[in-house]
Regions:
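PAPS-dependent sulfotransferases, especially Golgi type II membrane carbohydrate sulfotransferases
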Residues: 1-88, 202-217, 224, 228-232, ...
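Pre-Walker A adenine-sensing motif
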Residues: 88-98
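Post-Walker A helix-loop "phosphate-sensing" segment adjacent to the P-loop in P-loop NTPases
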Residues: 124-134
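Short beta-strand segments
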Residues: 243-246, 268-270, 342-345
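Flexible, glycine/threonine-enriched loop-and-boundary segments that flank and lead into catalytic domains
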Residues: 241-263
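Conserved phosphate-donor/acceptor-positioning beta-strand/loop module used by diverse small-molecule
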Residues: 256-282
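Glycine-rich phosphate-binding P-loop
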Residues: 106-126
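PAPS-dependent sulfation machinery
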Residues: 136-243
Length: 435
């Protein structure tokens, strides 16, 4: 019997027992996490409302499976445990909050457009670094002198997820040592579109759009201070260096990002949306299936298209008005070329080193010969950006390529994006490894 069949049987039994209809109680989970440290366990981090909004939406809209309920509970308790540990570390060493997070680079743009590929290339420069998957899951080693096995533990957790979602590695390869997206950090305070990717939670997403992301970005800054402070300790990696961060979801909250990181340098990666929207829908479906009793690919496809049409409009607006909405667009701001650097997917794949040089040049930074050699070497190991080849059908996700082309027309024309060739009713995926 397949694993999927076993899980369906487990869901049916849990449903009959009333387990799947039980309330997901935010207050109870917070109380459990606080039981050893009292009301100040999380310091001044506001979490009650966003967690309640998330859990209510999951219960009412996502149709969580038995595995999904267990995973959600584990996730919430893990995030709360990390918040407790961060607060305890700050109480023991208040200088953590003095760590300067200077002029970080944020890579963003449409998902599946090459943002991960560019992110990895930028991280080849020795002075650049990013939070790794294992650090966002467990930012501090175990207490009590226990052996630090975080990397091995996270690799085992990822392997377990792959057993539930065998298509995932082909869409988004991930290991414990891989650079992680900012969405996983923002999720600690339960204000992250990471939850929208994993769960069908339209009411939570609508609330997040209204409430804004400033508390989440302020927390991200704080989280980076903790990681940076650990790098300064004896025996740790030397130096603070430059943070290079990445997440497509930043396009929805650029004003809040800029408020938390006033000197942020932002890179937009542009690609033909018709070539990526199908892959976004596919990835979302793959992420949701292990955790939900039912997944509707057509609803996902149309929802992702609408969402990223909004993202495209916000990128145009930020380019005109500036990421802070202050009227300072591309022609003003930080560094040599302004606050936003624009790259096209085609130029990134055709000349990866040239694309990295363009980012450095735009922000008035120097790419030294050692870094150039490292970037060139990494690019040579990933020909065509490390892209895989596959094909998806638009109809499977309720999409029509002609309608998508028209829906994204303004964005394509604004940034002068060349359409990519492909079959009329399908799109050849050449982006999984570099997404």
């Amino acid at each position: 019997m397949s694993l999927a069949a076993v899980l369906r049987i487990a869901d049916a039994m849990a449903d009959r027992a009333g387990i799947l209809s039980r309330e997901l109680d935010a207050a109870a989970l917070i109380a459990r996490a606080r039981r050893h440290d009292g009301p100040d366990a999380f310091g001044d981090i506001p979490i009650a409302e966003p967690l309640a909004r998330l859990l209510d939406a999951c219960a009412a809209e996502a149709g969580p499976s038995l595995v999904g309920r267990a995973a959600l509970r584990w996730d919430v308790l893990r995030f709360l445990g990390n918040l407790r540990r961060l607060a305890a570390e700050e109480a023991a060493d208040p200088t953590i909050r003095d760590e300067p997070i200077a002029a970080p680079i944020f890579v963003t743009g449409l998902p599946r457009s090459g943002t991960s590929f560019l992110h990895r290339l930028l991280l080849e420069a020795p002075d650049n670094h990013a939070p790794r998957v294992w650090q966002t899951i467990a930012p501090y080693p175990p207490e009590g002198g226990r052996a630090d096995r975080r990397i091995a533990q996270v690799d085992r957790q990822l392997a377990a997820f792959v057993r539930l979602a065998p298509e995932f590695p082909g869409l988004h390869p991930l290991r414990a040592a891989s650079p992680q997206e900012c969405s996983e950090i923002l999720a600690h305070v339960f204000r992250s579109l990471r939850f929208d990717s994993t769960w069908r939670v339209p009411s939570y997403r609508a609330w997040l759009d209204r409430a804004g992301q400033l508390p989440a970005y302020l927390f991200e800054r704080r989280f980076l201070q903790h990681l940076q402070h650990q790098r300064r300790r004896p025996g740790a990696e030397p130096g603070a260096g430059r943070w290079v961060l990445k997440c497509p979801d930043h396009v929805f909250a650029l004003r809040d990002l800029r408020a938390a990181f006033p000197d942020a340098r932002i890179v937009f990666v542009h690609r033909d949306p018709v070539s990526v929207v199908l892959s976004v829908a596919k990835l979302t479906a793959v992420l949701r299936r292990p955790f939900s009793r039912a997944v509707d690919p057509i609803e996902i496809g149309r929802g992702e298209s609408a969402r990223w049409q909004l993202g495209a409009r916000l990128m145009m607006q930020a380019t005109t008005d500036g990421p802070a909405g202050d009227g300072a667009g591309d022609g003003a701001g930080d560094g040599a070329g302004g606050r936003i650097c624009h790259l096209h997917h085609a130029e990134l794949v055709a000349d990866p080193l040239g694309a990295v040089r363009q980012v450095y040049r735009h922000f008035g930074l120097r790419l030294d010969p050692i870094a150039e050699a490292a970037v060139a070497g990494a690019a040579s190991r990933q020909p065509n950006g490390g892209y895989a080849h596959d094909a998806y059908r638009f109809a499977d996700y309720g999409l029509d390529p002609a309608r998508e082309r028209e829906a994204f027309r303004d964005y394509v024309e604004y940034f002068d994006i060349l359409p990519e060739l492909g079959p009329p009713r399908a799109v050849r995926r050449t982006l999984s490894r570099a997404a």
